[in-house]
Amino acid sequence: MRRSPSQELAPGTWAPARRIAERVLGPIERFLHVEAASGVVLLVASAVALAWANSPWGDAYEHLWHVPITLGVGSLAFTQPLHFWINEGLMTIFFFVAGLEIRREIHEGELSDLKRAALPIAAAVGGMIAPALLYLSLNASPASRHGWGVPMATDIAFAVGVLALLGKRVPPALRVLLLALAIIDDIGAIIVIALFYSSGVVWSGLLVAAGGALAVGVLQRFGVRSPAAYVAPGAVVWWGMLRAGVHPTIAGVAIGLLTPVRSWFGSQGFVAAARDAVDRVAALTERDGHRADELLKPLGRIRQAQREALPPVVRLQAALHPWVAYGIMPLFAFANAGVRIDASSLGHAASGTILLGVTLGLVAGKPLGVFLASFAMVRLGVCALPRGVGWRGIAVVGCVAGIGFTMAIFIAGLAFGDAAMLAAAKLGVLLASAVAAVVGLLVGRLALSGAPAPGAALTLAEAEGSTEQ
């Protein structure tokens, strides 16, 4: 039935729909923007922690993280130091967001197609193996070799931040490649943590975690849409992992991977629901003497339709990512980057080789592994370089991938129980990350030109499919 002029949609009526389109079409641009800006916050938090730890008030810094915090009441109370709640509690949310990113990439991103994923997978694997081997070549003793996983990690916030400083020199396809590489690197780090940096498995704990995961699946099956309903079963998964001897942050990854990638509403369902609600708003506003509170229900329906038109994985990532980037990660850096630099803290016999192994692993091993693995895969014909990206661009990605920082510090905390060895590993991470950032900037300025190469992908949308050659 044809609408009368009074029923035609007024300008701005579809503003919610436009906002949804922007959120669906531009997730990578926003992701890169948040990551680049959060790198500055991370840097400030780390600098403050390092300065405080080496000041006359350094003991207060150490004591702060041992303050006991209790959650729960009575027999259900659980008491742990503040440092635990940051590293094992809040970091679970970080790993949950990482799980969401991985889930999206597998469904619709660079990891959804094997040919597109081949290059970033090869680069990431090479960038993990080479640093680990370089570290082990310098740390063969049982006391220090357990830290081989430390130089494998890449901090996506700092890496993307360095690329952002290079401005228009960096082609969009190179940014997408770095993003995909970093996500695969996260997958590798998660596997390493689960397999090599967790204590002996207690099967009863795994059964508890499996029960929590099953509850999540049941809620999804019955169409429960409120995120709050999933907090309790998610906490059960976390508790089960902790009791099982598996690092509890893995629970965040597991729940992230279980998050639905399809929206509750299809596009047609959203249009129908929104149109019906808009028609009701139009009818109410045309009626004399209508009350403002009568608009609450149809406007609420529009908001609900807008919310449910987005897949849960997209909506949760958009909601949590800024909190993780600007809150959890800087807090983690502040709690873990405060390394006291003196003879007593670095006096362990193995400290020197640990520091050297971590530093060289990130600064030299990362770019070498990324470049050689990419070169081998392209020469073997398994994949092709993205449009507009040359070998100089791959070298730049390898350099900035050596910025390990937060994830490397996280693994160091799992690898070393000795305070001096942990301090050496953290210092190596901080030193290597600073050097890798400077080298990445210098190589980027020298190797990348401001003009796009012929046939280069000019937008992120083009860049996402540019490896399908």
Swiss-Prot record:
<keyword id="KW-0813">Transport</keyword>
<dbReference type="InterPro" id="IPR023171">
    <property type="entry name" value="Na/H_antiporter_dom_sf"/>
</dbReference>
<keyword id="KW-1003">Cell membrane</keyword>
<keyword id="KW-0406">Ion transport</keyword>
<feature type="transmembrane region" description="Helical">
    <location>
        <begin position="82"/>
        <end position="102"/>
    </location>
</feature>
<keyword id="KW-0812">Transmembrane</keyword>
<feature type="transmembrane region" description="Helical">
    <location>
        <begin position="423"/>
        <end position="443"/>
    </location>
</feature>
<dbReference type="GO" id="GO:0015385">
    <property type="term" value="F:sodium:proton antiporter activity"/>
</dbReference>
<protein>
    <recommendedName>
        <fullName>Na(+)/H(+) antiporter NhaA 1</fullName>
    </recommendedName>
</protein>
<dbReference type="InterPro" id="IPR004670">
    <property type="entry name" value="NhaA"/>
</dbReference>
<keyword id="KW-1133">Transmembrane helix</keyword>
<dbReference type="GO" id="GO:0006885">
    <property type="term" value="P:regulation of pH"/>
</dbReference>
<keyword id="KW-0997">Cell inner membrane</keyword>
<feature type="transmembrane region" description="Helical">
    <location>
        <begin position="147"/>
        <end position="167"/>
    </location>
</feature>
<feature type="transmembrane region" description="Helical">
    <location>
        <begin position="319"/>
        <end position="339"/>
    </location>
</feature>
<feature type="transmembrane region" description="Helical">
    <location>
        <begin position="353"/>
        <end position="373"/>
    </location>
</feature>
<dbReference type="Pfam" id="PF06965">
    <property type="entry name" value="Na_H_antiport_1"/>
</dbReference>
<feature type="transmembrane region" description="Helical">
    <location>
        <begin position="118"/>
        <end position="138"/>
    </location>
</feature>
<comment type="function">
    <text>Na(+)/H(+) antiporter that extrudes sodium in exchange for external protons.</text>
</comment>
<comment type="similarity">
    <text>Belongs to the NhaA Na(+)/H(+) (TC 2.A.33) antiporter family.</text>
</comment>
<feature type="transmembrane region" description="Helical">
    <location>
        <begin position="176"/>
        <end position="196"/>
    </location>
</feature>
<feature type="transmembrane region" description="Helical">
    <location>
        <begin position="394"/>
        <end position="414"/>
    </location>
</feature>
<feature type="transmembrane region" description="Helical">
    <location>
        <begin position="199"/>
        <end position="219"/>
    </location>
</feature>
<keyword id="KW-0915">Sodium</keyword>
<feature type="transmembrane region" description="Helical">
    <location>
        <begin position="235"/>
        <end position="255"/>
    </location>
</feature>
<keyword id="KW-0739">Sodium transport</keyword>
<dbReference type="GO" id="GO:0005886">
    <property type="term" value="C:plasma membrane"/>
</dbReference>
<keyword id="KW-0472">Membrane</keyword>
<feature type="transmembrane region" description="Helical">
    <location>
        <begin position="31"/>
        <end position="51"/>
    </location>
</feature>
<keyword id="KW-0050">Antiport</keyword>
